[in-house]
Amino acid sequence: MERVCSHQLASSRGRPCIAGVQRSPIRLGTSSVAHVQVSPAGLGRYQRQRLQVVASAAAAAAFDPPGGVSAGFSQPQQQLPQQHPRQPQAVAEVAVAESVSAPASAAPSNDGSPTASMDGGPSSGLSAVPAAATATDLFSAAARLRLPNLSPIITWTFMLSYMAFMLIMPITALLQKASLVPLNVFIARATEPVAMHAYYVTFSCSLIAAAINCVFGFVLAWVLVRYNFAGKKILDAAVDLPFALPTSVAGLTLATVYGDEFFIGQFLQAQGVQVVFTRLGVVIAMIFVSFPFVVRTMQPVMQEIQKEMEEAAWSLGASQWRTFTDVVLPPLLPALLTGTALAFSRALGEFGSIVIVSSNFAFKDLIAPVLIFQCLEQYDYVGATVIGTVLLLISLVMMLAVNQLQKLARK
């Protein structure tokens, strides 16, 4: 096999050469790998890194797509049997065997730099074996971690069974029980003044809480992703507290903070602002329990945004506001709508904290979930079924509308 000194390769490609390194390209199927043999003179740190890169390429050669560009150096190439793309270990062994098949010795070239020869000299202290072996181990570990190829029938069976027991059957049971109620009774109970006011309070407070969380959740996610400061990890962990905290404990905490016994509540009452047992307390409770959804939805998407896109916009003369609205915000908008929709859904179904911080009086701050609970306490199962069905249908319509907005935002 004919080999070319790295000086000649460097001169032909216009790149700095690495003294003491010879490369001989070998075509494996549709890809070509440059194998390295090193002189005993030793290499520097940069040369060793280059050597490891070439050795790693030998292990990854089997994954080149058919018809890929080969790394030939206009020298005669030895044709080896094509390896199966699912056998990276065999390809790595061929590369390593070629790189260490014969010891390398120092032979001075025309310009006085040492080159590798195959005349049986002393072997080099540095070879491509560790890098290629490491790559082979990684490929083998990845192959062992592959999930089993389950049959589509098994996958669909498990998925549909889970969805049926966890989602479809409960909703179907509620709708089936609501269908047993006569239509005139259903309409009368669904349009009672108490029920209509409860719908209004529930959806208005949920929308306000979702809008506030949309703004401040976006800002907090931006700060956690873009800035480094003391206590960042503590703040990031504190965002998840509403997930782990029981809703009754959350209601008790809010009632204590905004009540008469805490300085915040005393200050607000001195200013004429009453929080506990009002709609404002309902909104604050909804904000508290639904706040993490916007932050956790926005963080992964913000981390994927490349800083180079903003720098490119700045280099073209765009202002910071123009860069934010035209470059940063469009890819974040679908995730922002998703987080806002999740926050709205969570606020809509909140019960445990609101039942503590609100007065639960009709025509004041009574919400639909609490009204359903009051109907169940009075053994009014028809009223609870009707109000629950109306709440379910309205929520479904609003979620479908949010999904359509997400599709428009992606376009």
UniProtKB/Swiss-Prot annotation:
Residues 1-54 form a transit peptide. The chain crosses the membrane at residues 153-173, 205-225, 237-257, 275-295, 324-344, 353-373, 382-402. It is found in: Plastid, Chloroplast membrane. Keywords: Chloroplast, Membrane, Plastid, Sulfate transport, Transit peptide, Transmembrane, Transmembrane helix, Transport. Induction: Up-regulated by sulfate deprivation, but not by other environmental stresses. PROSITE patterns: ABC_TM1. The keyword Plastid applies. Part of the chloroplast sulfate permease holocomplex. May form a heterodimer with SLUP2. Part of the ABC-type chloroplast envelope-localized sulfate transporter. Required for primary uptake and assimilation of sulfate and chloroplast protein biosynthesis. Belongs to the ATP-binding cassette (ABC) (TC 3.A.1) superfamily. This is Sulfate permease 1, chloroplastic. It comes from Chlamydomonas reinhardtii. The gene is SULP1.
